[in-house]
Regions:
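Conserved "HGTGT" condensation-loop signature of ketosynthase/thiolase-family condensing enzymes
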Residues: 1-150, 162-168, 177-181, 189-320
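Active-site histidine-anchored catalytic micro-motif
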Residues: 155
Length: 320
């Protein structure tokens, strides 16, 4: 609790384009096979994507693959501008002149090879580090990228919390996004298949993969939200019980409800982020903050949980 940091500003963005149903093609046999396996593992019969840069002139079966990557890069710029402008002027000037670190996150690590007709100039922006954002925030200290699949954002938050509590930096900026590349989305699901028992879904029989980008500015300065990252817990739920707090009024999670219920001895309100908002890879946990602002919650504590493939979980708490 003493190491808790404050989320001074956040911005999230998703495409304005509609959802497109994925349709397998014989031109890409491996992708079609992965799609079939993913549907079986998730007990669904279809998969819809919402992506930045969908092209009106693309062939129907290729519309979710042949997207314009520049729309994704542009969205990163926009959320960074919004997050910066949301700060009070004094804080904004302080950020530009203080010790500031920049962390870039995404779900896949090196995924530019899956982009349609990408230039060498923009390849490093997606795969390595968006230098335009580093310049925007006038960062001349530490910059890095975390490639932790769906855990990337929480790993970046843990690093940010350490930086701030050790007084190494005054501000830590975390920017990143999720590219809903069909083949990677299918194979990621196949790593951790769901149980055979079907679970109720908001849209029965359909998986939703929605691209989102986000920018989050953390500091020790008091903000609207206070955030504290907890430790990792293995499948032994007794360890988790020692860190459970009675003032938690809402538990948001990304994954199967059955994978987290063994960790709770007392009834608690659950929010399935993927069911409510669609899956956005490493950005999904940040949707719990969106939920707080969307419903104008005040005076409570929320725990956001991300189960892993081995029966364990990572989490962070948010006071609002």
């Amino acid at each position: 609790m003493d190491d808790a940091m404050h989320l001074l500003s956040l911005s999230l963005m998703e495409p304005e384009a509609p959802l497109f149903l994925y349709s397998p093609s014989w031109l890409n046999v491996w992708e079609a096979h992965s799609y079939d396996i993913a549907l079986k593992n998730t007990d669904t019969n279809s998969w819809a994507f919402k992506r930045f840069g969908t092209r009106a002139d693309a062939y129907d079966k290729e519309v979710v693959n042949r997207t314009n990557y520049m729309a994704y890069i542009s969205a990163l710029e926009k959320v960074s501008d919004v997050a910066m402008q949301a700060l009070p002027q004094k804080e904004r000037m302080l950020l530009m002149k203080s010790r500031t670190a920049f962390i870039y996150v995404d779900s896949w690590g090196e995924a530019a090879g899956f982009e349609y007709d990408i230039s060498t100039l923009h390849l490093s922006t997606i795969d390595t580090l968006p230098k335009n954002l580093v310049k925007k925030f006038s960062v001349d200290n530490v910059t890095c990228k975390i490639r932790g699949e769906k855990n990337a954002l929480i790993q970046a938050m843990r690093l940010a919390q350490d930086y701030l509590s050790w007084d190494i930096f005054d501000f830590v900026i975390v920017c990143g996004g999720y590219r809903a590349i069909p083949l990677l989305a299918f194979t990621a699901t196949n790593i951790n298949p769901r149980s055979k028992m079907k679970e109720s879904r908001k849209i029965p029989g359909m998986n939703l993969s929605i691209e989102r980008v986000g920018c989050f500015i953390f500091s020790q300065t008091t903000g609207d939200l206070k955030v504290n990252c907890g430790p990792y817990f293995s499948a032994d739920s007794s360890q988790y019980q020692k860190n459970y707090a009675s003032d938690i009024v809402l538990v948001a999670f990304s994954g199967r409800a059955s994978s987290i219920t063994p960790f709770f001895k007392h009834p608690v309100k659950l929010l399935d982020l993927e069911k409510k908002y669609g899956s956005s890879g490493c950005i999904t946990p940040a949707l719990s903050w969106h939920h707080i602002f969307q419903h104008a919650f005040k005076g409570g504590r929320m725990r956001t949980i991300l189960p892993d493939h081995n029966g364990g979980l990572t989490y962070f708490d948010t006071w609002y």
